[in-house]
Amino acid sequence: QAAGRSINLAMSSRGINALKYAGIFDQVKPLLIPMTGRMLHLKNGAKELQPYGQKKDEVIYSVSRFNLNQILIQTAEQEYNVDIKFEHSVLSYDTESAKLQMRSPIKDFFLDAQGILVADGAGSIIRKAFANKEPIMPTEEILPHSYKELTIPANNDGSFQLEKNALHVWPRGQFMLIALPNPTGDFTLTLF
């Protein structure tokens, strides 16, 4: 697990339904922590729980992005024969021929793509290739914000230092700190 790459997800019932549809909910379920609401930590030290719903089952779930990704990748590779490549980058993409020029840690090579699912992030070569192509015409706006991942460890006895079943938020003007619980008693925090 790379530092700064494990920001937790807050998963709604739609995400749960997608996991059930994919047949992997039972693998993910032990990783989920229900959060009944948003716990605001105000400047004066007061705390205010804002429930997500009126019923007990109206919750969202905290789940480790890293652990969820491991399950999704393993399922895609083993169950659906998907070939996932890490540490590869796209050098160019020809929209007419659907040909990708790729770079791996070992060599540069070309791929003919019948279909392509891209997750190459900010500065995407694929997005740029479609920049003036109808009907897609994507746009890109790099935000001036950044983030830092932090951790609140579990107590010595393994218990949570904060309320377990809440998404904790410290709103501070242009900055915000959020904390989501993990099954191990710690919290993953993100400072935006």
Task: Describe the residue ranges of each PLM region.
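Active-site-adjacent segment of FAD-dependent monooxygenases/related oxidoreductases
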Residues: 4-75
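N-terminal Rossmann-like FAD-binding beta1-loop-alpha1 element of flavoenzymes
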Residues: 1
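General small-molecule cofactor/ligand-binding pocket signal
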Residues: 83-85
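Conserved FAD-binding catalytic core of PHBH/FMO-like flavoproteins
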Residues: 74, 88-92, 97-192
